Swiss-Prot record:
Source organism superkingdom: Eukaryota
Protein name: Zinc transporter ZIP9
Swiss-Prot/TrEMBL keywords: Cell membrane, Cytoplasm, Glycoprotein, Golgi apparatus, Ion transport, Membrane, Mitochondrion, Nucleus, Transmembrane, Transmembrane helix, Transport, Zinc, Zinc transport
Family the entry assigns: Belongs to the ZIP transporter (TC 2.A.5) family.
GO process terms (BP): bicellular tight junction assembly; intracellular zinc ion homeostasis; regulation of cellular response to testosterone stimulus; regulation of vascular endothelial cell proliferation; zinc ion transmembrane transport
Residues carrying sugar: N29, N237
Subcellular localization: Golgi apparatus, trans-Golgi network membrane; Cell membrane; Cytoplasm, Perinuclear region; Mitochondrion
A GO molecular-function annotation: G protein-coupled receptor activity
Protein species of origin: Xenopus tropicalis (Western clawed frog)
Function noted in UniProt: Transports zinc ions across cell and organelle membranes into the cytoplasm and regulates intracellular zinc homeostasis. Participates in the zinc ions efflux out of the secretory compartments. Also functions as a membrane androgen receptor that mediates, through a G protein, the non-classical androgen signaling pathway, characterized by the activation of MAPK3/MAPK1 (Erk1/2) and transcription factors CREB1 or ATF1.
GO cellular component: a single term: mitochondrial membrane
Pfam families found in the cross-reference section: Zip
Key word Mitochondrion present: yes
Amino acid sequence: MDDFSSISLLSLAMLVGCYVSGIIPLAVNFSEEKLKLVTVLGAGLLCGTALAVIVPEGVHALYEEVLEAKHHDMGDIHKAKDAETGAEISAAHEHDHSNLHAYIGVSLVLGFVFMLLVDQIGSSHMHSADDPEAARAASSKITTTLGLVVHAAADGVALGAAASTSQTSVQLIVFVAIMLHKAPAAFGLVSFLMHAGLERNRIRKHLLVFALAAPVLSMLTYLGLSKSSKEALSEVNATGVAMLFSAGTFLYVATVHVLPEVGGMGHSHKPEVGATKGLSRLEVCALVLGCLIPLVLSIGHQH
């Protein structure tokens, strides 16, 4: 199968898988208590996915080429038995590794700061509304969706860059990594929007935009890359950088929007019953379970 057919199939699978997993909370009618529990589980899935799947996958993609090159060079050293050459090569690898460490931090921080700026710009436009609380809630819904769409778009670029390397194994690894977190993310996004009180038709539109972002960007990236730019991309390891940038956006959405929103849900329930602000024990268990599920899935998906 040629690269174009494989990237088309992977994009289609990504679109269908993401949309179907996002529809699940909409298809089932939850009571208010159960919806809260599902929302907390979704928040846990978003956080666990960011930390246990996306960051490690991005780091792995970044280091993969260097480790392979090092492996080949070590073989050459053993053949040559030349101590001086060996020292030079190991020094070059130390330099490579220090560069890669910088890439990791810069990509994560840029993703986080990018979403922070988008959030501030979005909320500054919203503050002119009469009801500041309603404006904040509306801004939160938009930012959450926008953050996940930006994240999905960066995923799409990563998959498109991986497809342009013509290595099926790299494509499949990136695809599996993306699917492992897109399904929980779609579930988390829809349950969060349901809790925020968005109408079902609008939730479906948000979900469709999120589901389309990665497939469309992966196709555009693959088709838009010329041969020379493909070589340049493989040199700077665009797949790893794009995944880490998307991890930064994902972390922002999970920690700054979804978690505080979920943590502050206690006050929306029967205020007279008592000051049960924060989460109940069952909700804490659901949150922890949500964080652990992506971890277990990622352990099962060994390279």
